[in-house]
Curated annotation (Swiss-Prot):
The gene is GRAP. This is GRB2-related adapter protein. InterPro entries: GRAP_N_SH3, Grb2-like, SH2, SH2_dom_sf, SH3-like_dom_sf, SH3_domain. It is a peripheral membrane protein. Couples signals from receptor and cytoplasmic tyrosine kinases to the Ras signaling pathway. Plays a role in the inner ear and in hearing. It comes from the Eukaryota.
Amino acid sequence: MESVALYSFQATESDELAFNKGDTLKILNMEDDQNWYKAELRGAEGFVPKNYIRLKPHPWYSGRISRQLAEEILMKRNHQGAFLIRESESSPGEFSVSVNYGDQVQHFKVLRDPSGKYYLWEEKFNSLNELVAFYRTTTIAKKRQVFLQDEEPLPKPPRACFAQAQFDFSAQDPSQLSFRRGDIIEVLERLDPSWWRGRLSGRIGFFPRSYVQPVHM
């Protein structure tokens, strides 16, 4: 995940990362502190204040979700090459690429060399964005042709396109959507029986189905 610095920041502690306005930072961990992200810039790593940067989100980044949930989501997307990138549950700051092979979901651990570059095989990249762009036109698999493809546009859920929150919900990771009781959420996907994907006030994320009630608008 990449971000752009909105302001310059001078580190005051040894574990902080200084940067200038306009710098592009690689975000390594967004989960462990609500006010600080761990990031990398030109080979140096450290913590940065989240209100000093703007994330460059992508629909393929799913945050810290489980391997099982990744498989459930991708197998319901009925085309080979559907993919997502998730953060490791056990090792924050490490990532995996999960890819629909048509008959199964394959998981690739994203490796990093001593200089901080990302790689799966021989080719190395400065960011996850570059890695994804490369494997859109080069097969990610060794024994078959599998190219990363964005999700095909899905029709909005029939009839009930909106849901009303019955309880407050606080997101546990960036892939989830927080809301308050009474909020009206636009439902974008219902691919998983337990977790839906929706939009509220410009924010998009997953939320528990049991917390909402479909409504007709």
